Amino acid sequence: MEGESTSAVLSGFVLGALAFQHLNTDSDTEGFLLGEVKGEAKNSITDSQMDDVEVVYTIDIQKYIPCYQLFSFYNSSGEVNEQALKKILSNVKKNVVGWYKFRRHSDQIMTFRERLLHKNLQEHFSNQDLVFLLLTPSIITESCSTHRLEHSLYKPQKGLFHRVPLVVANLGMSEQLGYKTVSGSCMSTGFSRAVQTHSSKFFEEDGSLKEVHKINEMYASLQEELKSICKKVEDSEQAVDKLVKDVNRLKREIEKRRGAQIQAAREKNIQKDPQENIFLCQALRTFFPNSEFLHSCVMSLKNRHVSKSSCNYNHHLDVVDNLTLMVEHTDIPEASPASTPQIIKHKALDLDDRWQFKRSRLLDTQDKRSKADTGSSNQDKASKMSSPETDEEIEKMKGFGEYSRSPTF
């Protein structure tokens, strides 16, 4: 397991000097704490062969710098004045471990302004481990002979301020009886002289390596190049996106125009329905009621196909004379009642009598010609002139007698 803990150490001399100086003032005071932070890892091995590592951070407060006036380095809203801080902490900025506030007759609670100021100081010093020491003196007797001084050290952790254990070192503590030693490096003069001779080739004046600066410069140049390339890529992506949108728009326009052209062609090719030959349809349905084949197509007056479906519509044509039917009773064979249904035929009486009369006269003329072997030409002419019919009508009558009589229309 691995854990962390933080504690602070303050010498009795520093705490006494701090209390004596600020108790002699008439108002609240504040300032900065100087020192160093040490880290120590403690490894404890248990019987279960598991290592228990604990990292202990110790904040050693060694000095303090007072500010004899409030709001000397910040304003009422807690914003830091960098110029004032630069004057106060001219050479000891790296040694700042925290700041303190000497507040009379108040509780050990940080105010909202102090929280904001502490957050701004953390950003200014780039130190998230900055601590805050709050000192609150108070008088406990009416004669002002006895004073009480309470102190607490606060450190922010996950957005909340927690108290850090503060140990005041004095001669009465058993663990502080021995002398305090500070380990220092022992450097020879020859080593120092050699380092100073060649340090200019490898180190800068502040002690940093030159190669590190060169690497940092190269890194910065690479970052600039990367930014420029990213900008170009972004511009190209935007251009491609724009082109894709234009292509999609043109495709939609092409599809729209193509659809309009197809629709126009369809409207152009669509013709009006031709007029149906209703007389032909009615005649087929009248004379051939059981023939579905003859009912399966509909023809127009111009002999054009209208539709493939059968015509089941009754046109209500009761006048059969309009169909120009020429039917003889003797020519149509009689159908048995069981095989075919009776068909009612309508004939015009005056037209039938006329054709019967003409046929009888034609037969008489043929008999006279067969009896006489030789006939006078004058008699032939007289017979021809006496008959009002023409040769064309006679030929029609002959044909009417020779061919089979079937209903025509």
From Swiss-Prot:
Q: Where, subcellularly, is it found?
A: Nucleus
Q: Which InterPro entries does the record match to this protein?
A: BRISC_Abraxas1, FAM175, MPN
User: Does the keyword Transcription belong to this entry?
Assistant: no
Q: Which Pfam families match?
A: MPN_2A_DUB_like (PF21125)
Note the effect listed for S404P.
Answer: Abolishes formation of a heterotetramer with BRCA1. Does not affect interaction with a first BRCA1 chain
Organism superkingdom: Eukaryota
Q: What is the effect of changing E402R?
A: Decreases formation of a heterotetramer with BRCA1
Motif interval(s): pSXXF motif? 406-409
Phosphoserine: residues carrying this PTM? S48, S386, S387, S404, S406
Consequence of substituting F400D = No effect on formation of a heterotetramer with BRCA1
One GO BP on record is: regulation of DNA repair
The Basic and acidic residues compositionally biased stretches are 362-372
Query: Could you name the Gene Ontology cellular component terms for this entry?
Result: BRCA1-A complex; nuclear body; nucleoplasm; nucleus
A Gene Ontology molecular-function term? Answer: polyubiquitin modification-dependent protein binding
Which residue stretches belong to region Disordered? Answer: 362-409
* Modifications made to the protein after synthesis: Phosphorylation of Ser-406 of the pSXXF motif by ATM or ATR constitutes a specific recognition motif for the BRCT domain of BRCA1. Ionizing radiation promotes rapid phosphorylation at Ser-404 and Ser-406 by ATM; this promotes recruitment of BRCA1 to sites of DNA damage.
Do you know which PROSITE patterns this protein is assigned to? MPN
Key words of the record? Chromatin regulator, Coiled coil, Disease variant, DNA damage, DNA repair, Nucleus, Phosphoprotein
Stretches of Polar residues bias are at 373-388
Spans traversing the lipid bilayer: none
Question: What residues does the MPN domain cover?
Answer: 7-160
Q: What does this protein do?
A: Involved in DNA damage response and double-strand break (DSB) repair. Component of the BRCA1-A complex, acting as a central scaffold protein that assembles the various components of the complex and mediates the recruitment of BRCA1. The BRCA1-A complex specifically recognizes 'Lys-63'-linked ubiquitinated histones H2A and H2AX at DNA lesion sites, leading to target the BRCA1-BARD1 heterodimer to sites of DNA damage at DSBs. This complex also possesses deubiquitinase activity that specifically removes 'Lys-63'-linked ubiquitin on histones H2A and H2AX.
The text of the family note is: Belongs to the FAM175 family. Abraxas subfamily.
- What is its quaternary makeup? Component of the ARISC complex, at least composed of UIMC1/RAP80, ABRAXAS1, BRCC3/BRCC36, BABAM2 and BABAM1/NBA1. Component of the BRCA1-A complex, at least composed of BRCA1, BARD1, UIMC1/RAP80, ABRAXAS1, BRCC3/BRCC36, BABAM2 and BABAM1/NBA1. In the complex, interacts directly with UIMC1/RAP80, BRCC3/BRCC36 and BABAM2. Interacts directly (when phosphorylated at Ser-406) with BRCA1. Homodimer. The homodimer interacts directly (when phosphorylated at Ser-404 and Ser-406) with two BRCA1 chains, giving rise to a heterotetramer. Binds polyubiquitin.
Q: Tell me what this protein is called.
A: BRCA1-A complex subunit Abraxas 1
Q: Gene name?
A: ABRAXAS1
